[in-house]
C-alpha cells in the first residue's frame, strides 16, 4: 500500500468512526448502527468498511486503541528523554496535559463505550495496567526516597484518581477542562511530595 492509499484508508476509517458516533448519538442504541447505512452515507461499498471492521463493536475498539497507542508513543518519548527527578516529574505531568489536549469532541461517548462493550472493557483493563506501570516508574524516579510499599500504594491511588478524573473530564465542556486539569495536577503533586504517604 502506497502513501496515498494509506492516507485514504485512514481517512475512511475516521469517517466510519464519526458516522457510527453520529448514529449512536441519534438512536441511542449500538444495535442501530448499520454498516449498510454508513456505506451509503460515505458512498463506499460495505466491503470497504468490513475490510477494516468486523463488527460495530470493532469500530469503537479500534478507535480506542488508536487513541491510546498515540498517547503511549508520545508519553514513552518523554520518559525516554528523562534523566533527572525533575525530568521524570515533567513526564508525569505531560501525560495528563497530552491526554486532555487530545480528547475528541465525542470523548464522552467513547468513554462510556469503553466501560460497556466487552472487547473495549478488556482493552481498558489491559491498558490500565500499562498506565499504572508507568505511573509507578515515574513516581519512583520523580520523587526519590520512597520505599517500595509507598510507591506501590501511591501508584495505585494515582491510577484510581486518574480514571475518576477521566470519567469527570470527558463530560464537561472543552473550555473548562484546563482549569480542572490544573487543579488535578496540583492535588497529585501535593500528595506525591509526601515521602511516607499522602
Model-derived regions, located:
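Basic, helix-initiating cap at the start of DNA-binding domains
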Residues: 1-29, 37
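Helix-turn-helix
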Residues: 15, 26-58, 62
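Alpha-helical DNA-contacting segments of helix-turn-helix folds
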Residues: 15, 24, 58-70, 123-127
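An amphipathic alpha-helix signature
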Residues: 89, 93, 97, 129-140, ...
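Amphipathic alpha-helical segments used for helix-helix packing
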Residues: 100-122, 167, 171
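Amphipathic alpha-helical packing segments from all-alpha helical-bundle domains
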Residues: 102, 118-144, 152-156
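Hydrophobic/aromatic-rich alpha-helical bundle segments in the mid-to-C-terminal region
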Residues: 142-188, 198
Amino acid at each position: 500500500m502506497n502513501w496515498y492509499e494509506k492516507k485514504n484508508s485512514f481517512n475512511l476509517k475516521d469517517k466510519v468512526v464519526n458516522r457510527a458516533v453520529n448514529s449512536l448519538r441519534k438512536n441511542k442504541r449500538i444495535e442501530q448502527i448499520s454498516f449498510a447505512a454508513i456505506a451509503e452515507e460515505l458512498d463506499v461499498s460495505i466491503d470497504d468498511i468490513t475490510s477494516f471492521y468486523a463488527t460495530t463493536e470493532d469500530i469503537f475498539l479500534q478507535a480506542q486503541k488508536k487513541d491510546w497507542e498515540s498517547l503511549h508513543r508520545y508519553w514513552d518519548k518523554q520518559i525516554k528523554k528523562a534523566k533527572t527527578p525533575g525530568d521524570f516529574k515533567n513526564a508525569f505531568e505531560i501525560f495528563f496535559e497530552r491526554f486532555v489536549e487530545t480528547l475528541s469532541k465525542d470523548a464522552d461517548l467513547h468513554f462510556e463505550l469503553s466501560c460497556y462493550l466487552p472487547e473495549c472493557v478488556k482493552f481498558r483493563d489491559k491498558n490500565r495496567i500499562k498506565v499504572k506501570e508507568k505511573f509507578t516508574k515515574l513516581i519512583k524516579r520523580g520523587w526519590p526516597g520512597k520505599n517500595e510499599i509507598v510507591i506501590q500504594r501511591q501508584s495505585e491511588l494515582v491510577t484510581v484518581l486518574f480514571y475518576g478524573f477521566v470519567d469527570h473530564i470527558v463530560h464537561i465542556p472543552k473550555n473548562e477542562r484546563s482549569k480542572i486539569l490544573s487543579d488535578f495536577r496540583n492535588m497529585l503533586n501535593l500528595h506525591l511530595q509526601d515521602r511516607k504517604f499522602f
